[in-house]
Amino acid sequence: MSKYHPLTTEEAIEFVKNIPGFFSQEAQLECREIGDGNLNLVFHITDSKSNKSIIAKQALPYVKIVGESWPLSLDRARIEREALQQEHQLCPELVPAVLGYDDELALTVMEDLSSHTIMRKGLIEGNTYPLFANHIGEFLARTLFFTSDLGMNQQDKKELVKRFINPELCKITEDLILDEPYRFSDNNNYGVYIEDEAEALRTDQVLHLEVALLRERFMTRTEALLHGDLHTGSIFVTAESTKVIDPEFAFYGPMGFDIGAVIANLLLNYAAQPGWTSGEKALKEKRDWLLETAIQVWEQFESRFRTLWDEHVTDHLARTPGYQDLYLQKVLQDTIGFAGCKVIRRIISLSHVADIDTIADPDIKEAAERLALAIGKALVLCNRKLHSIRELGDIVRTATAIQTKGASRI
């Protein structure tokens, strides 16, 4: 019989007391549950004497936003913990350390990041992070290269593919991102004022073809171990530091899905900026920074990935002239396509982003949603034609100009 049960704050304290070498025997531990996501309990445990602190995260057997009618396997906690360990091994400065775990309790204990800010919150507050593109480019290059056939023994990689089969959470992605926004679904969640946009998504067969091709790649391409949910709510930042958390959606899939997720969330904040920034000059500066950062995410990833390829690939066929360029061209196209799907999903499907949802002015919020959808659709429609990440700037600025001009006529 399983010992699993949702922990109380007292039980969380008792568990972390037994982690070797962290809290002293004289520690006076206090605990509060701070989880604000849909899938987990998160306990913040602090020693009031030393101020040392730790995080304990426990998976729930259902989706909190829906309830017990949407059950989930607790094995995702094991997947998240192993993904964190894998990522920390490859990028120790960019991923919190796992300090303890209990797979039966679906519990992982890790380094506390209270000194950092959730990136989504920081962006909403108007902060910029000049080192972010460098850091996340490094994270993406190392985690994707060294878990792919390019960077590890191919047979060992196949064993990892087995360990990270994650059907339930992949199904969430397949439904919420790559299916339901393009048809009627009870999971869709949007304001009636953009029903025209939702109807356009349901009837655009050209768009559907591109989404179908991206969905096929998501479901069939085991290129590398992905984080699987790499949005700005899964990234903690300071001006000097970046930490990636929450890889419970981890699985083997197409590299562009992770890179596209980061870019998509920067573009969602771009669309939301009129709700958070006053004045044309300040708005332009903030949007320019967000767009340039999105471009730099790819450029930093690509530069590091090429270096890792040149230094570490042992398969002689992977060194064939032209292969590296073609490989990365396809990853770029996937990145843009998946970024577009991610943007669309955050407006139409379940679970939106605070960047847009918490805008107080309803007219500004609607304009942000319409701009996000225009950007998302443009990215999906052009993904197979893209040859340079710098084209992203033209696509986004064109969509912005068209939406702004259209809004001024109303």
Predicted regions and their residues:
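ATP-dependent phospho-/nucleotidyl transfer catalytic cores
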Residues: 118-227, 238
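Active-site acidic catalytic loop and adjacent metal/ATP-binding pocket
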Residues: 32-49, 54-55, 211-257
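Short, flexible, glycine-rich and Lys/Arg-enriched loop motifs at helix boundaries
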Residues: 61-73, 271-286, 310-325
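Active-site activation/catalytic loop segments of kinase-like enzymes and analogous catalytic loops
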Residues: 82, 256-313, 339-355
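ATP/Mg2+ or Mg2+-diphosphate-binding catalytic cores
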Residues: 321-410
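Conserved NTP-binding catalytic cores of kinases and kinase-like/nucleotidyltransferase enzymes
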Residues: 1-106, 390-410
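Conserved ATP-binding subdomain of kinase catalytic cores across diverse folds
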Residues: 50-53, 58-169
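A glycine-centered beta->alpha junction motif in the catalytic cores
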Residues: 59-65, 112-126, 145, 268, ...
